[in-house]
């Protein structure tokens, strides 16, 4: 939902886009199929990168996915150590190789509590790293950094994002579980569209 809305937001802003997805043997692999379909729908080039070395989280089958709201301490089990830094490193390398001057990252305020690599301090450190990692400086775009999930959902609704094609559930079944933190937060965000 976040990445798809980010894609539509950047297309609306006039950016030329290529999309990367990452297969880290995550439990919720359905998100990869969703990303492919959405990129086909929008005509955006999509590449799937393999990074199977990420482990140590309920999202990589190292324990059960906790149920409930993200604010709960148990949700820390869904942190994949250093995941976003690894993904951003791959993204900046790909951007430089392909002549892009920016990388977009869909982090948002709703993730700040649980995920250290979605916080402003992390983003600022990555911006500095992007400026120093190569002769070519690459800008890190984070338009949703201070937005909550409801704001992202409402922006997506404005852009006619096909939310029905997106996948959010951490369980990875055939249907969303409706109980994991990702499902709970998505339901609240979607309800905010109707309330607006």
Model-derived features with residue positions:
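Short cysteine/histidine-rich metal-coordination sites, predominantly Zn2+-binding motifs
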Residues: 172-173, 194-196
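Local cysteine-cluster metal-coordination motifs and their immediate loop/turn environment
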Residues: 89, 165-188
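Flexible, glycine-/basic-rich loop-and-beta segments that form/coincide
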Residues: 187, 193-194
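Glycine-rich nucleotide phosphate-binding loop and flanking beta-alpha elements
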Residues: 111, 190-191
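ATP-dependent adenylation/nucleotidyltransferase module used to activate substrates
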Residues: 1-160
């Amino acid at each position: 939902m976040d990445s798809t809305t980010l894609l539509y937001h950047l297309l609306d802003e006039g950016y030329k886009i290529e999309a990367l997805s990452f297969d880290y043997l995550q439990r919720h692999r359905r998100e990869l199929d969703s990303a492919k379909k959405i990129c086909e729908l929008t005509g955006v080039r999509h590449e799937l990168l393999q990074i199977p070395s990420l482990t140590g989280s309920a999202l990589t089958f190292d324990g059960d996915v906790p149920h409930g709201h993200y604010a709960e301490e148990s949700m820390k089990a869904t942190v994949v150590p250093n995941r976003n830094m690894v993904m951003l490193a791959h993204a900046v390398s790909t951007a430089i190789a392909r002549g892009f001057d920016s990388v977009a990252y869909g982090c948002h305020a709703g993730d700040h509590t649980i995920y250290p690599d979605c916080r402003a301090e992390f983003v600022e450190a990555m911006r500095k790293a992007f400026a120093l990692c190569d002769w070519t400086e690459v800008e890190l775009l984070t338009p949703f950094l201070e937005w909550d999930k409801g704001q992202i959902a409402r922006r997506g609704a404005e852009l006619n994002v096909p939310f029905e094609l997106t996948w959010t559930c951490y369980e990875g079944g055939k249907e969303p579980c409706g109980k994991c933190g990702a499902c709970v937060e998505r339901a609240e965000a979607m309800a905010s569209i109707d309330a607006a």
